[in-house]
């Protein structure tokens, strides 16, 4: 990991990205998305994870996360380890149609990392960025929520089930999040906050 992208302050919120090795599109399958969300929910309820925003895409996930206990790095390690083990187990045992191809990619990636015994699911590193201003917070929330729109999956961010955009517009959602305080009534770009609120 580059020196500029490390978690120096374990107490404050960070923008994080977890990416599947070789950008393999694992999360096109609902079963794997649900494993990921179940893990996040467990960590919210039992390990002090605070989420302000998230989105699950086909091969990566963005989070705006904080640890109540000042142990963000430990939380990340737990989430990545648990989800990797459970998803890999499911791929092996459930007859996933792409299993041979995916497992070969994960096996190849593991050979370059001595910490892995057989397979590596997640890329090393999380590209952490400290959330230090309201403007930065809202720009990252906008970036997270607009991922499915930019990818052509939905036309409005809140229509995408696997993100926190629905939380911010009062719709039903899969995960509870700690909503960021909206610093202005309508955070449009002209206000200085780079948020495409009309597309949420």
Predicted regions and their residues:
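Short catalytic/metal-binding and nucleic-acid-binding patches
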Residues: 1-200
């Amino acid at each position: 990991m580059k020196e500029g992208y490390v978690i120096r302050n374990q107490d404050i919120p960070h923008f994080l990205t977890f990416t599947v090795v070789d950008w393999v599109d694992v999360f096109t399958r609902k079963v794997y998305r649900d494993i990921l969300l179940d893990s996040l929910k467990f960590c919210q309820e039992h390990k002090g994870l605070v989420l302000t925003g998230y989105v699950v895409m086909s091969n990566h996930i963005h989070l705006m996360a904080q640890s109540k206990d000042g142990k963000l790095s430990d939380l990340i390690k737990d989430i990545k380890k648990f989800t990797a083990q459970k998803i890999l187990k499911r791929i092996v045992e459930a007859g996933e149609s792409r299993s041979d191809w995916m497992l070969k990619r994960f096996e190849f990636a593991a050979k370059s990392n001595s910490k892995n015994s057989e397979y590596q699911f997640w890329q090393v590193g999380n590209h952490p960025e400290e959330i230090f201003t309201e403007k930065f917070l809202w720009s990252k929330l906008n970036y997270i929520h607009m991922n499915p729109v930019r990818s052509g999956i939905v036309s409005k961010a809140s229509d995408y089930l696997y993100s926190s955009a629905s939380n911010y517009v009062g719709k039903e959602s899969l995960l509870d999040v700690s909503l960021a305080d909206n610093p202005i009534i309508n955070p449009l770009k002209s206000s200085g906050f780079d948020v495409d609120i009309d597309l949420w």
